Amino acid sequence: MKRLLILSLLLEAVCGNENFVGHQVLRISAADEAQVQKVKELEDLEHLQLDFWRDAARAGIPIDVRVPFPSIQSVKAFLEYHGISYEIMIEDVQLLLDEEKQQMSAFQARALSTDSFNYATYHTLDEIYEFMDLLVAEHPQLVSKIQIGNTFEGRPIHVLKFSTGGTNRPAIWIDTGIHSREWVTQASGVWFAKKITKDYGQDPTFTAVLDNMDIFLEIVTNPDGFAYTHKTNRMWRKTRSHTQGSLCVGVDPNRNWDAGFGMAGASSNPCSETYRGKFPNSEVEVKSIVDFVTSHGNIKAFISIHSYSQLLLYPYGYTSEPAPDQAELDQLAKSAVTALTSLHGTKFKYGSIIDTIYQASGSTIDWTYSQGIKYSFTFELRDTGLRGFLLPASQIIPTAEETWLALLTIMDHTVKHPY
């Protein structure tokens, strides 16, 4: 096994798989606004090739950044010179990637049913799409697969529809993996899909949800980016579209929505991880959802699932003005977080995007809320930075289990509070 792993790593190196040997993830603690601004100066130095996992927002909020090996000494010297404290969260990113790849290689057997599918490992795009087909074949009266569009690179964008019948019923939308490197979200989405088929008719609360509403689940919301994380660059976040006049690829699909687009909280630089794109809905992955939601016209809850930081967020992100339904959203978020914590003790914070983390313009749930979808939420799943986007596969099922309890709380509330 060890020889095979070494051989596979060598082959990937030859084929252009990006290497992260010696890269470190630093947690920076800015004591005041002046130090936050100094960290932002670092962010603007493109030659350092820094990858901010948690942005420099305001004092008191941790800033996590992946630093390439050639830039480590410069970054640490800069921070120390300005009296900015930091700690090393991940000593060598590549070591964690090697562990992740070895774990995946050990569980590559092709599943013949969704019962034998391994929910405790990470899967490729093809494997997830095969899982979707298996689920539809096993539960044709409950599950169907619809294609809402094609990606920039021509891949189909699939959504699972769970329904007990009827036309244009009120519906709940859940998406995972809009940021491609957040692998625990796509893995959780797969688990949710199976959970829906298992719990319908068994769990009275969930059965009541599906008896009254359809559920749409988009497990891989950014297929091009997700495929790229498996084949080339595990740390890829954005779409894979091309921007005229720039060699940099991709747009942040969570800054591309028509809600506060172009305001502070997104970047106009195509090389930035938070590049918003040239205009709202420029990304077909975003436009496909916009068109679907608009044409459906009866979506009552919209939940977009990210990682990491252990947060449950509601609008707004682009403005500090409270959402008209803030009191209800805040109380519902509190109830959902309480349910989540009850299973494994995982602590979540909750609140509006702008008050809880930072200003973010052009975000998914700000747009859905502007379309009249009252129950618009974003999750940030495990963890709080110890492993970040490289969450061990052993945490997939516990993460999905606890998140399901929060989702069920939101779905149950949505059914019981029609509008």
Curated annotation (Swiss-Prot):
SUPFAM superfamilies: Protease propeptides/inhibitors, Zn-dependent exopeptidases. Disulfide bonds join 248-271. Residues 121-414 form the Peptidase M14 domain. GO terms for cellular component: extracellular space. The keyword DNA damage does not apply. It is an enzyme of class 3 (hydrolase). Its EC number is 3.4.17.1. Residues 17-110 form a propeptide. Monomer. May form a complex with proelastase 2. Belongs to the peptidase M14 family. This is Carboxypeptidase A1.
